[in-house]
Amino acid sequence: MTIKEIANLAGVSISTVSKIINNKDQNINPETRSRVLKIVKDYNYTPYGNVKNISTAKSFQIGVLLRSGSQTNLMLSGILHAAQESGYSILLYDSGNDMEMELKHITSLCKNNADGIIWEPVSEQSMQYERYFTEQNISVCYINGYTECSFLIDFARMGYILTQKLLDYKHTRLACLLKEKSQRSALVLEGFKKCLYENQIPYSEKMELYISDREYFSKIINYGISGIVSSHFASSLILYEQMERLHYYIPSDLSLVSLKDDVREGISFPHISSVKIPYCEFGSYICRELIDKCEKREHDPEYLFAAPYVFDNEDSLEPPSFMRVRKIVVVG
């Protein structure tokens, strides 16, 4: 952050900022002084700060700058474990989906001379801030970002595996239960479509159901759906509860498969057939990749992260009701 940028943010001249930070502000309006000082502190400005801080000495600190604090704890655990294993400490920041807050955190990370950053940008516009890290020679690994060189969990692959499991149970009338404006849901749907295509099952927009749609359950019944792929475990629980309330049951009336994140790990009932999202493994992986960059052990990384995907149970799976053999016992 330069003195010119501070002046622009405060709406004053460069000389005014210079006078305030050098205690030569006797003739400056107190309100202006307070505003400038707040911006100086918020954006971690220090005179000649861009002349580094360019110490070549390593700090053995890694910054983690997340889009929001709703990130899974297991991903952070994975990052922390991999960092400690290699002798690094972590600086953790939450942008709160706010680009202004994000920039303040970026200037703080630069001031603290972090060796590298794991960065989840708030928006595509956030990429303009990349120059602050470039100027300080700070290595960056992006996650869930707006660049081709961004690390992602392969949710499309997971969507494919969930769908294939229903097909293995002979379900062909399928739907995908999603959340609107969710990157995870969009990728799960992509895998869902690919699996249908490769199994020569026609795709229809009617197969897309959104948990925010009050009519989604009626659509399941009216469309004769026998199997559901769910991108979020919370949505699966809502569906499960609604079915029981209306005297429909899983798996006898509907088979259900879902992704499951770590906040749901302790739920032992209902038994929904799920694949755990590998957040911890992902966190460890991106941290190791960043440390390799910091220590000049660069190679071509795999940006799409995949792990062995295993169902925790198959309790919410049965073949479609019309395929089940009914046994009749004749007495007498």
Report residues per predicted region.
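N-terminal helix-turn-helix DNA-binding module of bacterial transcription factors
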Residues: 1-57
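Short beta-strand segments enriched in small/hydrophobic residues
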Residues: 14-18, 54-69, 173-179, 330
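Amphipathic helical "hinge" segments at domain boundaries
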Residues: 30, 45-108, 112-116, 193-197
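Periplasmic-binding protein-like
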Residues: 63, 106, 113-121, 173-179, ...
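Flexible loop/hinge segments that line or gate small-molecule binding clefts
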Residues: 119-161, 234, 260-272
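Hydrophobic alpha-helical segments within soluble ligand-binding/sensing domains
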Residues: 147-176, 186, 212-218, 236, ...
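An alpha-beta-alpha
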Residues: 162-201, 302-316, 321-329
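Flexible loop/turn connectors
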Residues: 218-332
